[in-house]
Amino acid sequence: MILRLFILLSIITVYLQLSVGIQQQFEFAITLKSKILFVDEHWNVVNTAAHEFDELSALTFDESEERIYFNDGQHQNSSIFSLRKVGKSNHLAEQTIQRYGNESVGGIAYDPLNRTIYWSDLLQKKIFYASIDTVATEMPKILVDLSEENGTPYGVAIDICGRKLYWTNSNINHPTVERIDLNGTGRLAIIDKNIDSPRGIVVDQGAKRIFWIDDLKGIFFAVMSAQLDGSDVKLVLKDKNHEPQNLAVTRNAIYWTDRTTKSVWSHLKEPEIATTTTTTTTSTTQIPTVEGEEGTGAMDDNDIWPVGDFETTPKKSPLERKINLTEEARGIVARTGFYQLQKDSQCSKVIQLVKQRLDESQQNNRVLNVVDEQLDELQREHCLGGGTYYPQQKFCVCVPGYKGTRCETNECHNFCVHGTCQISEMGYPKCYCQPGYSGERCEVKKCLNFCQNGGDCQLDELTGEASCQCPSNFGGLRCEHNSTEICGLFCRLLKHDSNTSVPFGCHDICEQLAKDSSDLIAIPEYKHLDVCLAPNAWTGSVLMPLMISLILILLLLTIFIHGLRRLYKPKRPHIKKTFVVRKQARTNSSSDTPLTNRPLATEQCEITIENCCNMNICETPCFDPKLVEFAKSNCKDDKKILIHNMEDDLY
C-alpha cells in the first residue's frame, strides 16, 4: 500500500513538473542592461531572468539543451554564465567561465557537438574557447590572436554543420569578415572589400548564408548577406539613425537590437526592395512594449531622407519595429529549430551525435525500477508527435514537422489553404498549390482581382498562369490601360504637332472624341495601319537577311568559277620573236637632208617581242623609218606593223 502511494505521489509530482515546468516556449531572448527578456512569436513577454546582473551584453542559445549563455561585464568572479529556464518564473544562473582579467566580451557562440563556448575579447583582441565539461580544471585557450595585426574581433558565430567559426574584424584600417575551422586551421578572410565596421554576425544554417551588421560612416548602417564561402554578397537593407549591435535570423526575417531607439527591429531576409527608409507605415498594429512604454512602430515623417541612391518617394517600408524596451537593447538570439535540420545531409550527422550524447547522459543517470517505468510511460505521453523527452533538461525534442513545448503542433496542420503540405528537406512546411492558387500557403487565388476594368480572367491549362480578355477600349496584361484616355492624349498632341505618331487603332476613338472637342482633338490621317501590327514576312527582318545571303552565295560562286578557269585554261605560248631594222637608208626621197634623215646605223638593231611594251612599239627605241613615216595610226595599230616585219609567223 505504501509502495503504491509512493508511486502515485511520484507520478503526480512528475506530472506537475511537466505541466508547470515549461508552460510557454519562448522564441526570442534579448539582453538588456540588467536582465534577459524572453518573448514569444507574437513578441509578448513570457518571462524575464538574470535580474541579479548589472552589465549584460552578448548572449548565445544552446537549442539542443535549452541553455542560455550570456556575459556580464561587472561581475568580479566570472565573465560568462549559463542560464537554464526551468519554468514560467524560475531560472537558474550558473558560473561558466571565470574572470581572468579585464575582459570585454564582444560576442559569444556555442558548439553543441563538442559543448564548447567561443567568445571574442575586444581588449585583448583575441578569440578564446573553452569546453564546459573541463572549464573547472582547464584554462581557456586561444583560437585566434589578432593583437599583432591590431585587429578587433567583435561578433562570432558557428556553422554547426560545416564545423567553422565566423567572426567580424572591426579594424578601422582593414575591416574583414573571416572564418576558421574549429580545430584552429584554415583561417581565411572571406570578405575584405566594401566593408566599413562590421559588428554582429550570425550563421543561417537553413539558408547556408551568413548575415552581419556593418556600421557605415556617418549615421548609416547596413545589413549584409553572403554565402558561407564569402561569395554572392548582397545588401539586405541600408538605413540610418540606428546603432545596431547584434542580430538573429529565423526562416523568413532578420532581427537586430538598436541602442538608439531601445527597440528590436526586423526586416525580410529576401527584401522586395533592396534599399529602404524608415518611413511611416500604414499598419495599425500595436507595437508590444515593456513596462508601459508606448510604441509608435515607425520613425517620424520628418525622417524621410532623399540621399544618394536611396528611395525618395515615401512608401510602406518592410523595416518593422517589433518591440519597445525600457533599457538599452544589446544581444538577441532566436529559436531556429535545431533538431529540424536533421533532414539536411550536412547537418544530420551532427544532430544524430548530439542526440546520441543526450541519450547516453540520460541512461547513465537512471536506475530502472517500478517508479521509473511509470515515469517513462508518462514522459512518453508528455511529448506528442513522436517527440523524445529529456528529463534532465526538461524539454521535448520534436521530430521534423512538429513543434511546441510538447511537440503538440503539426506544422502542416491547416498550413496550406488550397494545396497539399509536405515537410521540406530543411524541416519547414511547404505547399504544393492547386491549379489557380499561389502564395506560400496557397492562399492567393490567381484570378482574384487580377483583371481590371471588367476584364475576364482565364487560366492557361499548361502553365496555370492567369491572363485577361479585355473589354473594348481597354488593353494591357491586366486590362489596366484605357485606350480612350491614351488615344485622347496622342490626338491632343497631334493637334499641336502634326508629326506625332498616333498608335494604331486610335482613329475611331479620336474621331468620336473630336465630336465633342474638335478644337482640342485632331483625327489621324490613316484609319488602319495594318502593316504596323502584322509586318510583311518579305520585308524588314526577313527580307534583309535573305538578300544578304543571296549576295554572299553569288560572290562565292563567282570566285569558284574564276578559280576553275585559272586551273583548266591552257598556258599561253612563250613568244620570243625578233624585229630587224634594215641597214640602208632611203635614197629615192628628194627631201632627205642631213637634218631630216637619221644617220645610218652601223649595225643591225633588233628587239625581242616579249620585251616590248605589251606588243606596243611606240615606246621601244627600235623602229622602221619607212613604215613609221607614213603611219598615222595610233598605238593600237603598232602591233600590225610589228607583225608585218617579222622574220616568220608568230605561231
Swiss-Prot record:
<feature type="glycosylation site" description="N-linked (GlcNAc...) asparagine">
    <location>
        <position position="324"/>
    </location>
</feature>
<feature type="glycosylation site" description="N-linked (GlcNAc...) asparagine">
    <location>
        <position position="102"/>
    </location>
</feature>
<comment type="similarity">
    <text>Belongs to the cueball family.</text>
</comment>
<dbReference type="InterPro" id="IPR050778">
    <property type="entry name" value="Cueball_EGF_LRP_Nidogen"/>
</dbReference>
<dbReference type="GO" id="GO:0045938">
    <property type="term" value="P:positive regulation of circadian sleep/wake cycle, sleep"/>
</dbReference>
<feature type="transmembrane region" description="Helical">
    <location>
        <begin position="541"/>
        <end position="561"/>
    </location>
</feature>
<keyword id="KW-0732">Signal</keyword>
<feature type="domain" description="EGF-like 3">
    <location>
        <begin position="443"/>
        <end position="480"/>
    </location>
</feature>
<dbReference type="InterPro" id="IPR000033">
    <property type="entry name" value="LDLR_classB_rpt"/>
</dbReference>
<keyword id="KW-0472">Membrane</keyword>
<feature type="disulfide bond">
    <location>
        <begin position="412"/>
        <end position="421"/>
    </location>
</feature>
<feature type="repeat" description="LDL-receptor class B 3">
    <location>
        <begin position="208"/>
        <end position="253"/>
    </location>
</feature>
<dbReference type="GO" id="GO:0048477">
    <property type="term" value="P:oogenesis"/>
</dbReference>
<dbReference type="InterPro" id="IPR000742">
    <property type="entry name" value="EGF-like_dom"/>
</dbReference>
<feature type="disulfide bond">
    <location>
        <begin position="398"/>
        <end position="407"/>
    </location>
</feature>
<feature type="glycosylation site" description="N-linked (GlcNAc...) asparagine">
    <location>
        <position position="183"/>
    </location>
</feature>
<feature type="topological domain" description="Cytoplasmic">
    <location>
        <begin position="562"/>
        <end position="651"/>
    </location>
</feature>
<feature type="disulfide bond">
    <location>
        <begin position="470"/>
        <end position="479"/>
    </location>
</feature>
<keyword id="KW-0812">Transmembrane</keyword>
<feature type="disulfide bond">
    <location>
        <begin position="451"/>
        <end position="468"/>
    </location>
</feature>
<keyword id="KW-0744">Spermatogenesis</keyword>
<feature type="signal peptide">
    <location>
        <begin position="1"/>
        <end position="21"/>
    </location>
</feature>
<keyword id="KW-0677">Repeat</keyword>
<feature type="disulfide bond">
    <location>
        <begin position="383"/>
        <end position="396"/>
    </location>
</feature>
<feature type="repeat" description="LDL-receptor class B 2">
    <location>
        <begin position="163"/>
        <end position="207"/>
    </location>
</feature>
<comment type="function">
    <text>Has a role in spermatogenesis and oogenesis.</text>
</comment>
<keyword id="KW-0325">Glycoprotein</keyword>
<keyword id="KW-0221">Differentiation</keyword>
<dbReference type="GO" id="GO:0017147">
    <property type="term" value="F:Wnt-protein binding"/>
</dbReference>
<keyword id="KW-0896">Oogenesis</keyword>
<protein>
    <recommendedName>
        <fullName>Protein cueball</fullName>
    </recommendedName>
</protein>
<dbReference type="InterPro" id="IPR011042">
    <property type="entry name" value="6-blade_b-propeller_TolB-like"/>
</dbReference>
<feature type="repeat" description="LDL-receptor class B 1">
    <location>
        <begin position="115"/>
        <end position="162"/>
    </location>
</feature>
<keyword id="KW-1133">Transmembrane helix</keyword>
<feature type="glycosylation site" description="N-linked (GlcNAc...) asparagine">
    <location>
        <position position="77"/>
    </location>
</feature>
<dbReference type="GO" id="GO:0007283">
    <property type="term" value="P:spermatogenesis"/>
</dbReference>
<feature type="disulfide bond">
    <location>
        <begin position="447"/>
        <end position="457"/>
    </location>
</feature>
<feature type="disulfide bond">
    <location>
        <begin position="416"/>
        <end position="431"/>
    </location>
</feature>
<dbReference type="GO" id="GO:0060070">
    <property type="term" value="P:canonical Wnt signaling pathway"/>
</dbReference>
<dbReference type="GO" id="GO:0005886">
    <property type="term" value="C:plasma membrane"/>
</dbReference>
<dbReference type="Pfam" id="PF00058">
    <property type="entry name" value="Ldl_recept_b"/>
</dbReference>
<keyword id="KW-0245">EGF-like domain</keyword>
